[in-house]
Amino acid sequence: MMPLPMNEFLQQSMQAGGFDLDFEVVEWGAMLLGYRSAPDAPASKGVDALNISLSYTDPSSMFRYWHSTSYSPTNQNWGHWSTPHLDDLLQQAQETFDPGERDKILAQAHALVVDEAPWVWIVHDLNPRAMSPHVKGFHPAQSWSQDFTSITME
């Protein structure tokens, strides 16, 4: 991903909608500290939002991002966003062991998150990469997890 052009595009797009964005550029570790802190904690630097790269490994991960018991600093609901109906759906999904039924519940939860939009999704990473022609054996994964064991240099 290319953070600077992505953020510049975001800033221009939001400005067209009447939002004035300023960025507080910080070192990655400082951003993670802010993300793992409460929104009003000093580590969050008084910002209203975080632009952080997160990956979804499973639809059930919605619980840690949006359930009201998942507020930071103990979990990952940094914005402390909540809605009782979503809490109910996510709790049902946690307690349902039939995969088909759980999928139906998570689909409802997903639809609610899409409609309510607690986050703005910035990018769908299609793995842009640049490398030397001397690198051989590299096959980009369609995820954040990359296997480097097959790479050689010629």
Region locations from a protein language model:
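Short, internal active-site loops enriched in acidic
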Residues: M1, G29-A30, N127-R129
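A short glycine-/small-residue-rich loop at the edge of a beta-strand within enzyme catalytic domains
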Residues: M1, L50, W81
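Bilobed "Venus flytrap"/periplasmic-binding protein-like clamshell domains
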Residues: M1-Q12, Q146
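Extracytoplasmic/secreted proteins, especially bacterial periplasmic and envelope-associated proteins
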Residues: P5-F9, A16, A30, G34, ...
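Periplasmic binding protein-like
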Residues: S13-S68, I105
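Short, solvent-exposed loop/beta-turn-alpha elements that line the ligand-binding surface or hinge
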Residues: R36-K45, R64-E95, H124-E154
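Bilobed periplasmic-binding protein-like "clamshell/Venus-flytrap" ligand-binding domains
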Residues: P42-S53, T96-P133
